[in-house]
Amino acid sequence: MTLDKLIEKLAAKSSILITPIIVKDYLAYQVEPNFLLPFLKALKESEELRFTVLTDLFGTDFPERDKRFEVIYNLLSLKLNKRLIIKVYISEKETIPSAMNIFNASCWYEREVYDMYGVNFDGNDDKRRILTDYEFEGHPLRKDFPLTGYTQVKYDEKLKKVAYEPVDLDIEYREFDFSSHWHSPSYVLPGDEKATDVIPAKAGIQK
């Protein structure tokens, strides 16, 4: 029996609704938040599958969608040497259950997704920032997060510590034009008259 059939058989046995999706060459499924933990637990404990390793957990943001956030779980079966992708779609107001009781490693991953996107995981109360500063405002990987951020950090000589203050751009926005302003001179430089029509072959260039 193929891997996809084994997974679908396992899901049906546990009354878990899953939807196959295309993610390049990887086997992938989409599940609703309420089916996430039963599905992860079944995949991990199945003697046939043994997806016992959570290799990654991350988020993406598609603000044009009603369910703007994707939370993606990458699983590995050492027994089968196979990988599996599980996706969960949620809106900005929805939460997603924490997988900490199934995969201990998910704690840090969930903190990262919260830090970058503001997605809340039920059961994981550790909301400490993990990539940004503890007093950072907002979630920088959201598509609607401003490029400048909301605050800037500077060392305050009077306070003798790092202080937060409103963004004050020292350099104005510029329009970057990567075309060169340098052009070859139209006049003949001394010695150019001695140039031959053919550059030596070892240079690899001919006129």
Swiss-Prot record:
Catalytic activity of the protein: a quinone + NADH + 5 H(+)(in) = a quinol + NAD(+) + 4 H(+)(out)
Keywords: Cell inner membrane, Cell membrane, Membrane, NAD, Quinone, Translocase, Transport, Ubiquinone
Cysteine pairs bridged by disulfides in the record: none
Keyword Transcription: no
GO cellular component, as recorded: plasma membrane
Annotated coiled-coil segments of the chain: none
UniProt-listed InterPro entries: NADH_DH_suC (IPR010218), NADH_quin_OxRdtase_su_C/D-like (IPR037232), NADH_UbQ_OxRdtase_30kDa_su (IPR001268)
Locations listed in the record: Cell inner membrane
Topology in the lipid bilayer: Peripheral membrane protein
Any one GO molecular-function label of the UniProt entry: NADH:ubiquinone reductase (non-electrogenic) activity
Primary enzyme class: translocase
EC number(s) recorded for this UniProt protein: 7.1.1.-
Family per similarity comment: Belongs to the complex I 30 kDa subunit family.
Protein task: NDH-1 shuttles electrons from NADH, via FMN and iron-sulfur (Fe-S) centers, to quinones in the respiratory chain. The immediate electron acceptor for the enzyme in this species is believed to be ubiquinone. Couples the redox reaction to proton translocation (for every two electrons transferred, four hydrogen ions are translocated across the cytoplasmic membrane), and thus conserves the redox energy in a proton gradient.
Self-association state and partner proteins as the record states: NDH-1 is composed of 14 different subunits. Subunits NuoB, C, D, E, F, and G constitute the peripheral sector of the complex.
Protein name, per record: NADH-quinone oxidoreductase subunit C
